[in-house]
């Protein structure tokens, strides 16, 4: 709800960066000192951490873009396909076994998403695909977590996610933070390309 309220006046990378800075501050002050200090950054799975971070960035940003254009209920309903995708991806990437009843449940769930998105009808809008993309990124995050969860701590994985968010948001700010690509009537596109502005006092609480 907070993200949706901010999507009409602020840039996506600005909103995400502020959230990231708050989360990183929390981790560095309240979590890292009690979990070995900066030793938590040591890892043998750096590439996997980067991939996980990019999956989260992909998932969050596409979902936030969906919130700018769709009713909250519709965006959340489509995003709920993520558990189904996790199951499918676990078969493909982790060789998990899924029984026929679970496959039937997946088919019913995917049919429900098709009913909501309504492809091929006049009611269809491209923004309906954004939460589906977000769900895909979220599902891949969980697959990668399964792969490294046995050797990497939760705090290490959390920190690398925030670092990835920070890098991506800063790069977005450098390349389009001046609003050079803004001016679209599409709310999702405008949220993505809007210029960085200083938050209004009454919006600071929502950012935090």
Regions found by a protein language model. Name each.
Residues 65-70, 117-126:
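Membrane-interface helix caps and helix-loop-helix hairpins in membrane proteins
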Residues 20-24, 80-84, 106-109, 113, ...:
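Residue-level recognition of pore/gate-forming positions within transmembrane alpha-helices
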Residues 82-104:
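C-terminal transmembrane-helix exit sites in multi-pass transporters
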Residues 1-5, 12, 27, 123-188, ...:
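Transmembrane alpha-helical segments that form core, pore/gating elements
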Residues 101-118, 134:
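Hydrophobic transmembrane alpha-helices of multi-pass small-molecule transport proteins
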Residues 38-62, 126-132, 182-208:
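Loop-to-transmembrane-helix transition segments
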Residues 9-57, 137-141, 161-177:
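Transmembrane alpha-helices of multi-pass small-molecule transport proteins
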Residues 8-14, 62-78, 153-155:
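Structural motif at transmembrane-helix junctions in multi-pass transporters
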């Amino acid at each position: 709800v907070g993200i949706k309220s901010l999507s009409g006046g602020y840039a996506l990378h600005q909103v995400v960066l502020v959230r990231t800075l708050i989360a990183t501050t929390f981790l560095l002050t309240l979590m890292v000192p009690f979990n070995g200090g900066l030793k938590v950054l040591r890892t043998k799975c750096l590439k996997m951490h980067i991939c996980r971070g990019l999956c989260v960035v992909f998932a969050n940003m596409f979902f936030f873009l969906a919130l700018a254009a769709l009713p909250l209920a519709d965006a959340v309903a489509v995003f709920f396909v993520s558990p189904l995708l996790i199951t499918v991806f676990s078969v493909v990437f982790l060789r998990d076994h899924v029984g026929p009843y679970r496959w039937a449940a997946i088919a019913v769930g995917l049919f429900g998403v098709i009913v909501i998105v309504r492809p091929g009808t006049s009611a269809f809008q491209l923004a309906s695909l954004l939460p589906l993309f977000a769900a895909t990124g979220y599902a891949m995050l969980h697959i990668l977590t399964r792969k490294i969860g046995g050797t990497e701590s939760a705090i290490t994985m959390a920190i690398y996610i925030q670092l990835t968010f920070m890098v991506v948001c800063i790069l977005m700010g450098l390349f389009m933070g001046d609003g050079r690509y803004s001016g679209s009537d599409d709310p999702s596109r405008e949220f993505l390309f809007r210029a960085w502005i200083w938050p209004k006092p009454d919006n600071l609480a929502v950012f935090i």
